[in-house]
Amino acid sequence: MTDRTTPAKKQADRFARAREKQSRALLEDYAELIGDLIAELGEARVADIAERMGVAQPTATKAISRLKREGLATARPYRGVFLTDDGADLADRVRA
């Protein structure tokens, strides 16, 4: 059997893998930062997360939504963002 994958398909696959790795690394950064803010300030507010990450609040909100979808964080209205046990474990692994 011959490999019929075109060069364009191979390149697209390579780019997709790179984007996924970058996306995962960014998620790890957010989890670590949320843990740091909670340890430092007792809470992690979206405004503080956005400021520390150097992004706009909607960008931080989108990343937090992904953390929540993946079961790594929870958010409470007017109370901030909190890491789940899995999120805290991820933040600890990133720090190590």
Predicted regions and their residues:
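Key DNA-contact positions within bacterial/archaeal DNA-binding proteins
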Residues: 58
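Short, hydrophobic-biased segments on the C-terminal half of alpha helices
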Residues: 64-65
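Basic, amphipathic "hinge/linker" alpha-helix immediately C-terminal to the N-terminal HTH DNA-binding motif
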Residues: 79-95
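Long, low-complexity, charged/polar intrinsically disordered regions in eukaryotic proteins
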Residues: 1-17
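N-terminal helix-turn-helix DNA-binding core of bacterial DNA-binding proteins
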Residues: 13-55
